[in-house]
A protein has these predicted regions:
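Short aromatic-glycine-enriched beta-strand elements
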Residues: 47-58
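OB-fold/S1-family single-stranded nucleic acid-binding modules
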Residues: 100-123
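Short, structured beta-strand/loop micro-motifs enriched in basic residues and often containing a Trp
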Residues: 71-79
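Short nucleic-acid-contacting surface segments enriched for D/E, G, S/T with interspersed K/R
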Residues: 79-95
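Conserved hydrophobic positions within beta-strands
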Residues: 39-41
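Short boundary/loop segments of OB/S1/cold-shock single-stranded nucleic-acid-binding domains
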Residues: 21-35
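Bacterial N-terminal signal peptides that target proteins for export
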Residues: 1-9
Length: 124
């Protein structure tokens, strides 16, 4: 088998593994745990592959913590007709999701806004 064909063959074997690794949240987040975090939205990035939310949270002993969070794709948000304006920078929200295995992070699957609107984002 010529070298080019071998390289292409090996490359085709690797693509599914890389794809699965990217979409498996279990590598970065712990799907066996669910926590809730309440705070103020400091940044939003509405883009694929995952919508990103940053929050400032008052933790234990009144210490301010910055959290980085992800949720489903922008494509899913559109499909589910979730308007990006349902939360904005400066809003106080409560979120539930799977905590990061390292650091202050969360994979969000539920958002409760300050005015009582609850939005489910396809979680467990």
């Amino acid at each position: 088998m010529p070298i080019i064909r071998r390289i292409l063959f090996i490359g085709l074997l690797v693509v599914p593994v890389v794809s699965i690794a990217h979409h498996a949240i279990a590598g970065r987040y712990d799907p066996t745990k669910t926590i809730e975090v309440e705070g103020v939205v400091t940044n939003l990035l509405w883009r694929n592959p995952h919508v990103q939310v940053s929050m400032r949270v008052i933790g234990e002993n009144e210490i301010t913590q910055d959290w980085s969070m992800s949720t489903t794709s922008l494509s899913n948000m559109r499909r589910w007709q979730i308007d990006p304006d349902f939360i904005e920078v400066g809003d106080a929200i409560r979120v539930a999701g799977n905590p990061a295995r390292v650091g202050r992070g969360l994979y969000i699957f539920n958002v409760l806004t300050d005015d009582g609107e609850e939005v489910l984002l396809g979680g467990t």
